[in-house]
Amino acid sequence: MKILHISDTHGKHHQLKDLPEADVVVHTGDITEEGTEEEVKDFIEWFCSLPYKHKIFIAGNHDDCLYGANIEDLPDDVHYLCNDGITIDGIKFYGVPMFLHDDLDGNLPELFGRIPDDTDVLLTHQPPLGILDEQDGINYGDYTLKRVMDVRPKCHLFGHLHHTVKTQEVFRRVRFSNAAGGKYGRYELLKI
């Protein structure tokens, strides 16, 4: 399965041109810049129009207007994951968004603890601590995402940090992908 991974488009998704062929396109958050409903509607319209068989997205820290939202009337091939998952062609995707409310309320360890052990592709907005998370010599990843090493998915896809954009295979054959350069027209293509 080919996965096109994009993230952190911050309302500039229309700048992504000539995207490669893939079976699934995944957006790991920060679809908006200001977090407005208008930005979300524009993104969803664009995302639904993409020529991929399956489309999955989660929310990032800029997408707070989606906190507690129930997105209805999405086409059958478009999936918004909010602490839940979907199986596509036998591959189990699970998505955990990044909402400031959950972070401030201390809910992230519980939410990460719910990641199913049989997850194949984990989607979060933020990286785990120490993996593709360094900016200016400081690691900004989330310590509570250590659950990734218990689950050991085939891939962990995220964004959030714009200066470490690459795919890298690390530790116990888990492939980590940071595609946070979406607003600059960058993406990652993975095969699992």
Give a label for each model feature:
Residues 91-121, 138-147:
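Binuclear metal-dependent hydrolase catalytic cores centered on His/Asp/Glu-rich metal-binding motifs
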Residues 18-20, 47-52, 73-75, 115-117, ...:
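Short, conserved loop/helix-junction motifs that constitute active-site signature segments
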Residues 5-7, 25-30, 56-61, 81-82, ...:
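Active-site neighborhood of phospho(di)ester-bond hydrolases with catalytic His/Asp-centered motifs
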Residues 6-88:
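Core catalytic region of metal-dependent phosphoesterases/phosphodiesterases
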